């Protein structure tokens, strides 16, 4: 699971190829990951670090999910392209579970898609000894990391919607949003609504202990959930992969909906009824 050690390791690796000015903000002649809340300086967060963090967290997630994928006879693959469902070289899947270990995939080979919205969550000070020293959790600084950032949530939601509406093949693939922070109170009901509608299967935090203060660990209907350990993550993923799911969305009169339900109900068992209902929806 995500820890402060992962964040310190990121900075130690990144500083070998980047200047400190490209990784941290300068506040009162010192370098911080984020501006502390007690300071009111005008600072500019270096945009260059966003790409560095993005690449690092995508690799971290691939490593984290490697064994879980293999337990399900699948491969964890970064940067998956599948043009038929809207995953282009410009907008690939950050991570996907696939039946082959290739970046270019057919829709049938993609069994699970992850959109990764992770980042540096805590605050760090770059010391005179050229070390990165923890100086406060996310409640002590002015940044909005990971799922606490509204535009990150909106981008993840928008990409998921595009996957759902781009083709019929994209309607069968589960989508999970990965983060390493809580969500804001304003998104508690929104994430539940999105998951109930089937657009996204779950928003997940892989950071069990981001603060000792009160924070949202899960939403009322579990659309967002913080996992405590890898075993629980693996159990949830196995459950998702073992569920035969279809995304469907339609707006119609009750009479028309009732007719579809009536026709589907004539099938011999629940699975056939579900398949028939989906087929009828496609004909609308």
Predicted regions mapped to residue ranges:
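Phosphate/oxyanion-binding active-site loops and adjacent basic polyanion-contact surfaces
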Residues: 53-61, 88, 148-153
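Short hydrophobic-acidic sequence motifs that mark active-site Asp/Glu residues
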Residues: 92, 111-115
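Interdomain/boundary linker segments immediately adjacent to catalytic/signaling cores
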Residues: 1-80, 261, 284
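A short acidic/basic microdomain associated with nuclease active sites
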Residues: 66-102
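Catalytic cores of nucleic-acid endonucleases
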Residues: 116-185
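Short, solvent-exposed loop/turn segments that connect beta-strands within catalytic domains
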Residues: 101-109
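A generic secondary-structure signal
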Residues: 64-68, 159-166, 193
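Non-catalytic C-terminal interaction segments of nucleic acid-processing enzymes
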Residues: 169, 180-284
